Amino acid sequence: MKKFRGSAAVAGLSVLALTLAGCAATEELTPTSSPTAVTEEATLAPLITVGWNDIVDTFNTSSAAGNNVANSLTAYLTSSSFNYYDNSPALVKNTEFGTYEVVSEDPLTVSYTVNDGVVWSDGTAIDGADLALAWATIFGKFKDADGVYMFSHAAPKDNVASKLPTISGSTITFEYDVQYVDWELAFGIGVAAHGAVQMAYPDLSIADAKSKLIDSVMNEDTEWLAAVATVWNEGYSSVNTPENPLVYLSSGPYVLEELVEEQYSTHVLNPLYTWGPKPQYERVTIRQIEDSTAAIQAVDNGEIQIASGQPTADVLALVQALANAEYASSEEAAYEHIDLTVNNGGPFDPASYGGDAATALKVRQAFLLSVPRNEIIEKLIKPLNPDAKVRTSVLFIPGAEGYDEAESYYSDYLGTDDENRVKAKALLAEAGVSTPIDVEFWYPEGNVRRGQEYELLKLSADSVGFNLIDESEPNWAFTETVFPDLNPHDATIFAWAATSLSVSGDDQYLVLGGPSNWTGFDNAAAKGLLDELNVAVDPAEQLRIRLAIEAELAKDAYNITLFQFPGLTWWDNEVTGVSPNLLVPYFYWNFWNWAPTAG
C-alpha cells in the first residue's frame, strides 16, 4: 500500500503529474540564466535537518506510484534537469546540466542535449539512453494489448508527440504532432536508463543496457521493454534504504545515504556533481514530523533547522512565539477541494438510481451545497490569513483573469451557508430520494485541519439529509485506483499542489482513465476542450477554452473548491538563505543557498 501524502498531491508536468492551471499566463515564464554556484573553496557545514510531514518511499517520481510531495522533495535534492522554477516564480534554465532549443516551428521540433561530463552518481554518463527512456515514458508511446500504458507515468501525454525521436550521443530531437503550448515544461530526465534495464536484465553490462534500451525504443520492441516497464512502475518503492543502489542513483547535488521508515532520510553530497549550484551543507536530513506542534518544538530545541506545515491558528501563534526563529506565511499554489465519486455505485452515481442521471446530479448538487465553506474559512483559515476568501473555481486562482466569470458558473453555491442548506434540502426533496443518504467520506487520518473540516462538514451535511461516514485513514489507498478500478470512497478531500505554471495538464484528472481521475468523471465536451487547450498558444484562446471547461465542471457538479492553501514555514535564525516558494518544492527550491548564519 502506498504510504502517501500528509497534505497534497503533486501537480505539474514533465516528471510529475497534472497541472494546476491558471497560476500565470504563459508569457510570464521568462527563462533566466543559471544561478551562481557556491565556490569550490567554501567550507561546508556538516548537517542541516529539516522537517516534513512525510518522507520518501518511492524514488521514481515520474511514475503514478511515486507522484507525491514527499517523494518530490528527495527527488529535488538528488536530481538535475534542464530547468526549474525560482520563487518569482520564473523558469530558470540550468545550462550547466544541458541545453534545449526549438529546431523548427512548423512542425514544432525540439532538441535536448546533456552536457559532456554530466554523470549519474555511479559515474555512468547521462546520455541518449536516459533521454530515450524519458521520451518513451513521458509521451506514453507504448501500451499493452488492452490499451493500458506500459510505463505508468503520472501524466502521460500520448496525444502530442507520437513520432519516434532521433537520438545521437547525448542529444535527442523529436517532433510534436501539434503546436504544444507547454513544450518547455514537458520533458525532463527521470530515473537512470541503465539502472532500470539492469534491474530488469541483471546480466547486461551498462553499455549493453543502454544500447538495448535505445534499440528497443526505436524498434518499438514492446516484448523486451515489458520487463523494463515493470521495474519502472514497481521497482523504485522502498521505505528503508534500498539494497540495490540502482534504485536511488542521483544526477543531482545529493545522493541518498540512509532511509529509515517513517523516521528520516539522509542525503550526502554527490562527489561527482559539478553541473549546477553547490550546496553549503555536507548532508541534508529530512525528518518525518507529522504534527506541526512537534515540528515547532523541534525547531525551538535545535533538533531541526527548518520546518513547514499546514497551519492552524494555534500553530501560527506558537510559531510567532518562537524566540530563536523566523517565519514566513503566504498562500501557496495549491487549493483544497472535495471530489465526488460518480462511478462506484454510491450516492453520486447515476447507477444507484437506475441510471437516472438527473437524480444523481441533484444529489451531488445538494451535497456540494451542504459544504459550509464560509464557516470553514471563518473558523479555520482567516485566523491564518485575515484576507482569506472562498475559492470558487477549479481552474482559476482568485484574482486571475477569468476568475470572476468562472465564479458566475457556480452562482447557485454563492449564498450563505444557511441559504445553501435550504437549497440542498429542496434539491433532495425534488430528487425524491430517501434520506438520510450515506456518504462514505475520506480524509487523511492525523491531519488536524482536515479533521476539523470534516467535523464542520458532517454537522452541516447531516442537517440537510446526508449521513457522513468517517472513512479516514493515513495511506491514501484510493490514489492507487486507475480506471476501471473504482475509488471506494464517495467523497474525498485533499489539495492539488502545483509544480509549474503550465497551461495544459488538467486532463490527468478530468479525462476518464487519466492516472489521477479517481472520481470516474467522464465528460466528452470537457475532453475535447482539453485537447484544444494543448495547442492553444494565444492567451485569449486559452482563456476561452478554460472557461468552457469550467462551465462543464459546474454543469456536472464535479466537485467543490474550498480555499487557496495557506503556507507557513519557520526556521532557526542561525540558518540563512531560506526562501519559501508558492510552487512545489516549496522552501526546498534553493537548498543550495541554505547556510549557517555568519559569526
Segment roles from a protein language model:
Residues 242-245, 272-318:
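Ligand-site clamp/hinge motif
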Residues 48-105, 249:
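N-terminal lobe/hinge region of extracytoplasmic solute-binding protein
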Residues 150-231:
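Surface-exposed binding/hinge segments that line
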Residues 41, 363-365, 369, 373, ...:
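Extracytoplasmic/peripheral linker and loop segments enriched in polar/acidic and small residues
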Residues 50, 123, 300, 304-306, ...:
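Periplasmic binding protein-like
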Residues 100-147, 166-175, 182, 295-298, ...:
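Aromatic- and charge-enriched surface segment that lines or borders ligand/interaction sites
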Residues 49, 126-136, 169, 173, ...:
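Alpha-helical secondary-structure segments
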Residues 384-427, 446-450:
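Structural transition elements
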